[in-house]
Structures are given as C-alpha cells and as structure tokens.
Amino acid sequence: MDHADIEREYFIHVPEADADTAPLPLVLSFHGYTSTARTNLRYTGLQPLAESEKFIAVYPQGTVLASTGEPHWNSESSAIPSATDDIGFVETLLDELTETRNIDTDRIYAIGMSNGGMMSYLLACRLSQRIAAITSVTGTMTVDRNTCTGSRPVPVMQIHGIEDAVVPFNGSNSFPSIPATIEFWAQSNGCVGAAEETAIADITGDGYGGRRTRYLDCAQGTEVELITLDAVGHDWPIHVEGYRQHDIHAAEEIWNFLQRFSLYGGDT
C-alpha cells in the first residue's frame, strides 16, 4: 500500500472461519528497531492463537531510518529521531483493513516489541478513538507525556525483564523507567487504590520467577498491568516445549489481557 509517497508493506494472517462469521478482532504487531515484520511474525507466536481464538493478526513493516539504515517506527523518541508519519500510516492501514476485511472496529489492538512497544504507546496517545488496548514488550513510553491526551482511557499491559540492558527497567538517559510509564497510565486511566501484586511462578525451575502488578479499579473498566520477569533481558518471553523457556508465554498473556477490552470498556 502507498502512504505519503512511500510504498508500505505488511503481513496478514486471517483465521479460517465460516463465511457468516461475526466481525473479527484485529491485532497489530509492531517489530523492534533494526528488525522486520517477517521476523516479528516468526517469534511472537501470535498465529496459532489467531487461529484458535479467531482474530486477525497484522504485522506492519517499518521504514528505513535514513541516519542508520535500519528499520524503525517513529515513536516520537529522542533516541530514535525520525520524521516518518507512522501515525498516518497506521490510520491508512486501518482504513484499508476495515474496507477489505471483516474487522470488529471496536476491538482493534496494538502490541509491539521494543521500538514497536514504544509505537504502541504512541498509538494509545494519538489514536485512542480506534485502538481499544495495547501491550508493550521490552518497550517503554517515549512520547512526551504532556502531549498524550487521548479521547478515552486505554487499557495498557507492559511485559519487561529486570535484566533488560537495551531499554532498562529503571530507565536511562534515553528511555523513561518502566515504573514511571506504568504510573503515568494508572493516573491517566483514573485508577484508584493500591495495585494488586501477585507472584509469577518459577515454572522453568531456574530459581527465578517474576511479579504481576495490576491496577484494576480504573475508569470505564480499563486496567493497567505490569509483568516483571526476573533474570530476563531484552527478550520476547516464550514458553514452548523444546524451544526457549521462560516463565510466561507472552502471546497468551497478551491475548488474555487484550481480548477483554473494547472501545467501550472492559469485559467484552
């Protein structure tokens, strides 16, 4: 597809369904900096879930950043300065998908790895009238918080490893900390009361687990959730027998969270 005189690409997975099926939710999955849509398709593990849970998965491709020659998303990050109109691209992409596919426009979600997670936060700020909920894995919120004035509260999930050296959990000169990002969204979504904290079991037997922090009493039935994983770095957590082992399977955690929300609140 063409946007702003640039040929843009994406991969799409549409689950097998009867012709008379109801409109399907849509998950946009954004790759990280220096990565690709094809790579994102391979490591996220979304496609089996898209088949079993009946949602459409779309993997957009970022443009090449002129200063580095690497694929990226313009997440309004000072660490990855860009002039690419990726918000406009996503709007055009959503217009095309809703015209050509049977999309439930009340249940469009954005997820991403690293720079793709940063892009998901930007979409929560800029396109809250279209994006029902988001998840960031190893990303953080890089957009200026003073400009994040969406039209509605947006449910947010963050998955992050304590040992992440690329986007540090406790922040850096380039990236805000994960606790600060979660606190912003808890306030933005009008969450009240203390967060609920539970342990994530050490199912791999390596001596490490994690924590789940959830703000549940938020405006319009929204929630804010943080999954913190011990001894995990800048990685997309996967728990698949015979493959890489983590204490959670990110794709399942993400879908279990997202599927409960629409543009009109929680528990769809």
What residues fall within each predicted segment?
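A conserved short beta-strand
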Residues: 129-140, 155
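Alpha/beta-hydrolase-fold serine-hydrolase catalytic core, especially in secreted/extracellular enzymes
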Residues: 154, 186-268
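Short beta-strand/loop motif that positions the catalytic acidic residue
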Residues: 158-160, 164
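Acidic catalytic loop of the alpha/beta-hydrolase fold
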Residues: 164-167, 234-236
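Serine-hydrolase catalytic machinery in alpha/beta-hydrolase-like enzymes
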Residues: 3-17, 21-109, 118-126, 147, ...
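Alpha/beta-hydrolase fold active-site loops
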Residues: 25, 107, 154-155, 224
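Short beta-strand immediately N-terminal to the catalytic nucleophile in serine-hydrolase-like folds
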Residues: 110-112, 137
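Conserved alpha/beta-hydrolase "acid-adjacent" motif
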Residues: 165-177
